[in-house]
């Protein structure tokens, strides 16, 4: 994977990848907000793709993410909480398994920060809070076997 960033004007930059390009408009949206959005988009896409591969449907998916950062430089993430809210035609156990599979195995961006950042999550499925402030069960970079689940290509 390769990304090239080129300065356009003032605090605007163009990011080019092999698949396309987009404009980064700082300080309207800061680079750390783009980074956070990328983290959330990675796991959110898994919560669509994993169920789809199991002939299940997810609707009304919203994922909120919040970080606490160092006050001093470098202002890295200390903790990261994800709040998943979605409906599906699966039971609560399967819905929780999709989130865990994304966080523990498939989402490359979350797994990139998990050794240095405390990551927690909550899940509201079909209107019911089924997990609250759960911690990731791994953190040392080890894989967890969830069987055959195909996720969004990174």
Name these PLM-found stretches:
Residues 1-37, 48-154:
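Extended beta-strand/beta-hairpin segments
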